[in-house]
């Protein structure tokens, strides 16, 4: 049995009802949030999705160290992703907006440019989950990648879709981030990557 993200398996065995567990505290995961919106960056539209991400992830114990609204300019988005990963050393960057078919939707391109490794399963899981709700989910070009030791995840632009996509992946992300950061081993086998 694996109790991901809230407990670590120290050795194999069985857990029965009534057994006690030793809880080992872990540090909060640090996140950056980038909203990609031409209108939002000019103050012509209120950002609702960035604050929605913040509310959801803070309830899950994340610490938000940066939250910005930028234009859909690919270069600016890329630079902020790199800054958050390389200078702020956040565990995860969540972006919202700029993942559709519009000529100004540049978030996936900026994300792929920032990548040192691909992590497509996260974006695929969000699309799969969202397709159960709307066929328009197939129009998402969202990407999910790794930059060194930071995960970067593109989310849709609407608060409703942000909530749905985070529901699909958030429980598993913390485990993946801890493996990426070499703070945890594979789930269920009691190993640690740090020796």
Label every model-predicted segment.
Residues 4-195:
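Non-catalytic beta/alpha edge segments that cap or flank active sites
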């Amino acid at each position: 049995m694996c109790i991901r993200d809230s407990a670590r398996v120290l050795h194999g065995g069985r857990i029965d009802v009534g057994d006690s567990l030793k809880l080992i505290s872990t540090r909060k995961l640090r996140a950056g949030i980038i909203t990609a919106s031409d209108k939002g960056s000019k103050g012509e539209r209120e950002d609702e999705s960035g604050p929605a991400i913040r509310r959801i992830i803070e309830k899950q114990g994340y610490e938000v160290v940066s939250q910005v609204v930028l234009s859909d300019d690919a270069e600016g988005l890329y630079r902020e992703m790199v800054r958050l990963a390389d200078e702020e050393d956040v565990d995860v960057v969540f972006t919202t907006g700029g993942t559709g078919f519009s000529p100004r939707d540049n978030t996936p391109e900026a994300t792929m440019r920032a990548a040192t490794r691909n992590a497509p399963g996260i974006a695929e899981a969000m699309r799969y989950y969202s397709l159960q709700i709307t066929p328009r989910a197939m129009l998402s070009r969202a990407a999910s990648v790794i930059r060194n030791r930071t995960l970067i995840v593109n989310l849709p632009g609407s608060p409703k879709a942000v909530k749905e996509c985070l529901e699909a992946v958030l429980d598993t992300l913390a485990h993946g981030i801890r493996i990426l950061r070499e703070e945890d081993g594979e789930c269920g086998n009691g190993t640690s990557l740090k020796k």
